[in-house]
A protein has these predicted regions:
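Residues forming the flavin
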Residues: 1-173
């Protein structure tokens, strides 16, 4: 018997709330969860392990406990004005949008809207790009993404011949 405890109200963790629907439609996750349920896996939502249920109880009730808790704490930056209104962490922004989309097709307004806003996203990679795409879908007035990278060369390197794309500028979205 396998039991999965999920902190959120839906199964899937980062796949459910951290990756926008434009990249991963949630019916795919639901289908996988249904297959696991058919195989006997039990899912319990709304349980924050360590807070709602203690390790001692889990060790008493189960033969093995596997921690797959995911990253919950965002990486903050220390800069003057960081605590100003309108600054959000990426995962909070993405999660709120996805939850509102799944709950009400964004009609409940329980998300951080970028509609009509000039948005700057500090950070890159998949998470930064997911924020860019989500802001565009919200109808942001403009979206700028800043990412710390090594300085791009001014000219094409000898080991980067035509017809390959020149490696002089990076744009992810």
């Amino acid at each position: 018997q396998v039991t999965v405890f999920e902190r959120d109200d839906r199964i899937g963790g980062l796949l459910m709330y951290g990756i926008p629907n434009m990249k991963l439609e949630k019916w795919v996750i639901d289908r996988k969860v249904d297959i696991m349920k058919e195989e006997g896996v039990e899912f319990v939502t709304g349980v924050n392990v360590g807070k709602d249920v203690k390790a001692a109880k889990l060790l008493k009730d189960y033969d093995r406990v596997i921690l797959a808790c995911g990253a919950k704490n965002p990486r903050d930056i220390k800069t003057p004005g960081r605590d100003a209104k309108g600054i959000y962490f990426a995962v909070d922004f993405l999660k709120a949008t996805t939850k509102s989309l799944l709950d009400s097709d964004l009609k409940d307004n329980n998300y951080i809207s970028a509609k009509g806003k000039k948005v700057v996203i500090i950070g890159g990679g998949d998470t930064g790009n997911d924020c860019v795409g989500t802001c565009i879908r919200h109808g942001a007035a403009s979206v700028t993404q800043l990412e710390m990278m090594p300085k791009a060369p001014d000219t094409r390197a000898e080991d980067n011949p035509w017809p390959e794309w020149p490696k002089v500028c990076k744009t992810d979205y």
